[in-house]
Amino acid sequence: MSLWELEDRRSCQGTPRPAQEPTAEEATTAELQMKVDFFRKLGYSSAEIHSVLQKLGIQADTNTVLGELVKHGSAAERERQASPDPCPQLPLVPRGGGTPKAPTVETYPPEEDKEGSDLRPIVIDGSNVAMSHGNKDVFSCRGILLAVNWFLERGHTDITVFVPSWRKEQPRPDVPITDQHILRDLEKKKILVFTPSRRVGGKRVVCYDDRFIVKLAFESDGIVVSNDTYRDLQGERQEWKRFIEERLLMYSFVNDKFMPPDDPLGRHGPSLDNFLRKKPLTSEHKKQPCPYGRKCTYGIKCRFLHPERPSRPQRSVADELRANALLPPSRAASKDKNSRRPSPSSQPGSLPTEHEQCSPDRKKLGAQASPGTPREGLMQTFAPTGRSLPPSGSSGGSFGPSEWFPQTLDSLPYASQDCLDSGIGSLESQMSELWGVRGGGPGEPGPPRGPYAGYCTYGAELPATPAFSAFSRALGAGHFSVPADYAPPPAAFPPREYWSEPYQLPPPTQRLQEPQAPGPGADRGPWGGAGRLAKERASVYTKLCGVFPPHLVEAVMSRFPQLLDPQQLAAEILSYKSQHLSE
């Protein structure tokens, strides 16, 4: 190959030139571009990356730049949410479709605004609060600030404090004021308002600031914060009186802590949260279920919920009778007629009793007594199971051991069941009426107490003992006092360990022969009446004994032998009891 050809080949291939070193500016630009590409892969825009790199510098660490980008991105997101796009893009629709409606942006008020709008306006008696915080010796403006801050922390925005304008004057030894600058600060925030006052002839003329407070709170349907009851203003207007009773929020200061009560209107009123709201959040005062359940012995006085007895009246039987005694006779009679319940003996499907199966005469008696009044049904219900009370005119019959077996509480009439709720005494009186009284000796069954002592049931027979004869004579005479020779032995009923235990049953005794001659009062009822009158009096006596002590019932019914209305008798018993308090 010739030299000329070799030079031509070199000229065609080109001779390599030495590489030139990049400048510092080019290196910086390349590094910047590399970092921008790296952060763009993470989802950040070029503008955000350039602003952060310009702030931190190109030599900043990758973690530092990434942290700043995260902060910058969250701030931009908040700004984007705060100012939504006024012209949102319309959604794409297929060809031929209708014109899409522009989406409406629903603006919801902030949660704090909704919370504040539901709260009542607050009107604070500044003088009362300041003097209370100063222990009634110093006008402590710090107390006003504590009260205002307490309501501001709860979300209240409408707060007004009234203070007389003369409190802006320089304090004097006789009128000490502390932290007076707080009044000016609250006035600048438009929370505190000074009531007008001026000097006339060297004397200070002060407007009545209490009237400002009550008037503004009444017109704005707000809350008055004060320990003053404003008695003078209650007498001016009736609506102000009602408003002050329902909207006055009292308070206490525990050192520097403002403490209003959790129950501003008492333990049965609304809570503090609902008291300060225009609409209560939840329904309150849901009673908790009673922990004792069906074993509860408090009756209607129990403050817990008893779902097993939903139809219980809210008032006791005594309160019902007292209320009925104050009603006119016509309204009381209609109310008593509506409140009566059907007796268990009138329910369908009841088994025939023993006396209906053994004697046709007894069947006739039952047929005659069946269409009677509800009082007769109540009286028959009170009789022992399987027995019926014959009319008072029947002289035959006697008492037997089967008549002394107690009833269950379910078989009691409703009047007796209601009075079990009135306490321990009424329960024991019911038990004593059910089991009766034993007298004469350990083996002799004594006559029962109560209005049924004069009646004889179909069964065994009793001897004419002196105690029984004396008791019969006492019944025939028209009163129920037990004679002196009638003394029940202490061994008749063993003592009970607990009051809730029932009396133990007496031991069964053998049936004795019927006395030859009935007592002089055997053909008459307990009060000397006969037939329907005696039954009605017995029924009324049973009802009243469930409410009042038996001796009071006997005394009043003996004074008014022809009076059978329970409401009138209850009124007479109350009157008699008030006149004989020493008994």
From Swiss-Prot:
* Keyword presence, Cell inner membrane: no
Q: Identify the stretch(es) annotated as RNA binding.
A: 198-204
Q: How is it modified after translation?
A: Phosphorylated by IRAK1; phosphorylation is necessary for subsequent phosphorylation by the I-kappa-B-kinase (IKK) complex. Phosphorylated by I-kappa-B-kinase (IKK) subunits IKBKB/IKKB and CHUK/IKKA at Ser-422 and Ser-426; these phosphorylations promote ubiquitin proteasome-mediated degradation of ZC3H12A and hence facilitates rapid and robust production of IL-6 mRNA in response to toll-like receptor (TLR) or IL-1 receptor stimuli.
Membrane-spanning intervals of the chain: none
* Region of interest called Ubiquitin association domain, as start-end residue ranges on this chain: 26-71
Q: Where is this chain primarily localised?
A: nucleus
What keywords were assigned to this record? Angiogenesis, Apoptosis, Cytoplasm, Developmental protein, Differentiation, Endonuclease, Endoplasmic reticulum, Hydrolase, Magnesium, Membrane, Metal-binding, Nuclease, Nucleus, Phosphoprotein, Ubl conjugation, Zinc, Zinc-finger
Top-rank lineage group of the source organism: Eukaryota
Q: How is the cofactor bound?
A: Mg(2+) is required for RNase activity.
The terms describing its cellular component in GO are:
cytoplasm; cytoplasmic ribonucleoprotein granule; cytoskeleton; nucleoplasm; nucleus; P-body; protein-containing complex; rough endoplasmic reticulum membrane
Q: Which residues, renumbered to this chain, carry the PTM Phosphoserine?
A: S83, S422, S426
Could you tell me the EC number(s) of this protein? 3.1.-.-
A GO term for molecular function: cysteine-type deubiquitinase activity
Basic and acidic residues bias: start-end ranges: 1-11, 73-82, 353-364
Show the segment(s) annotated as RNase. Answer: 96-281
Location(s) in or outside the cell: Nucleus; Cytoplasm; Cytoplasm, P-body; Rough endoplasmic reticulum membrane
Q: From which residue to which does any coiled coil extend?
A: none
Enzyme class per UniProt: hydrolase
Zinc fingers (C3H1-type) by residue: 284-309
The entry sums up its family as follows:
Belongs to the ZC3H12 family.
The function of this protein is:
Endoribonuclease involved in various biological functions such as cellular inflammatory response and immune homeostasis, glial differentiation of neuroprogenitor cells, cell death of cardiomyocytes, adipogenesis and angiogenesis. Functions as an endoribonuclease involved in mRNA decay. Modulates the inflammatory response by promoting the degradation of a set of translationally active cytokine-induced inflammation-related mRNAs, such as IL6 and IL12B, during the early phase of inflammation.
Q: What is this protein called?
A: Ribonuclease ZC3H12A
Species the sequence originates in: Bos taurus
The record lists the lineage as: Eukaryota, Metazoa, Chordata, Craniata, Vertebrata
Q: Which gene encodes it?
A: ZC3H12A
